[in-house]
Every structure is written in C-alpha cells, then in structure tokens.
C-alpha cells in the first residue's frame, strides 16, 4: 500500500509505498498438567467455551517480517520469544478460581531500516509480564506490561507496551473494557 507518515530521520512526512510479508509459528510444551473440572456446562464450561486446565507450560514464538519500501529501503526482522505460563484453578467456582501468570522474554535480529517512524524496529530485546485473575463469577481482570531490556538501545528500561482489561466472560460471549496507558487508548 501507499503510506504517508512521519519519517524516522526527520519531522517531514514521507510518501512511499510499503509491502510486507509476515510469518509466525507458536509452540507450547506442557511441563505440568492438572485435572480439569468435570466436563459439564455447570462446571468446566460454566464461564469458558473450553475447559481450563491448571498447569505450567513453556511457550515459544518465532516470527519474521520482510518489508520493502518505495525508496529502495528494506527492513527484515526475525524474532524469537518464549517463557513460562502458570495456570491455577479451573474457572468454574464463583470466586478466585482462575489465575494465569505469564513471563515472556524475546530478542530480535534486524537487517536494514524502515524510512517510517511508525514501523521502525527499535525494541530488539524485550521482557513482558502478564496476569489474569478471576474476581467473581465471570468477571476477570487482566494486566500486562512489556519493557525494553536491550542494553544497547537508547530506550533501555522503557515501558514499550502496557494494558489493563476488565472482562465479563461467559461460555458463548465475552464483553470487556481495556485501557492501554502506554498508548493512551481504550475501548470496548
């Protein structure tokens, strides 16, 4: 597509076409697996369309982005991220029966640079932490934060993303409100 956006190297607008290809592969390796609640609509499927199983798993993701721009520049990245996810509870009881905690670290190799400010790959080392907690019934609260942990980056130690979400989740639908303090946006 053709884009008009702020240039990465100046305050001027750049007007260039941009084409990209993205690929991603996820994997999960269970280290410990508990038992689900009885597989009935009143228990395991009370608030969720799938049975929540307590456990500990290692998750990983490999993705690549190949981007070409109208001025001849290219930006190519390959990223690897992973970490543990701990799930406690079955999300079938009325109070505090589901907690999920995730920690994810990641690194990115980059070749070239984007002429645009909005898609410049600058966070090449990241650390993220997220938690989801059942409060009462189908009411969940989630929060997450990601940091730049690349010591060679001028943004080292900066928050690169954050979110807070309150969600009402039932077996066949969910409704939520989120707010992203980093971006200053929210929605339903």
Where are these regions (language model features)?
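Outer-membrane beta-barrel proteins and related beta-barrel translocases across Gram-negative bacteria
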Residues: 1-188
């Amino acid at each position: 597509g053709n884009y008009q956006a702020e240039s990465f190297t100046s305050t001027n607008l750049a007007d260039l076409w941009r084409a990209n290809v993205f690929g991603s592969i996820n994997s999960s390796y269970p280290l410990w697996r508990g038992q689900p609640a009885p597989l009935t609509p009143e228990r395991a499927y009370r608030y969720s369309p799938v049975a929540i199983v307590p456990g500990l798993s290692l998750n990983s993701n490999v993705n690549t982005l190949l981007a070409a721009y109208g001025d001849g520049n290219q930006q190519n990245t390959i990223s690897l991220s992973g970490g543990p996810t701990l799930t406690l509870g079955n999300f079938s009881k009325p109070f505090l029966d589901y907690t999920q905690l995730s920690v994810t670290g990641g690194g990115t190799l980059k070749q070239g640079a984007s002429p645009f400010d909005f898609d410049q790959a600058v966070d090449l080392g990241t650390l993220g932490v997220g938690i989801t907690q059942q409060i009462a019934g189908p009411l969940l609260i989630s929060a997450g934060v990601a940091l730049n942990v690349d010591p060679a980056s001028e943004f080292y130690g900066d928050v690169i993303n954050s979110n807070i979400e309150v969600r009402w989740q039932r077996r066949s639908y969910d409704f939520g409100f989120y707010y992203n303090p980093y971006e200053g946006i929210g929605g339903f």
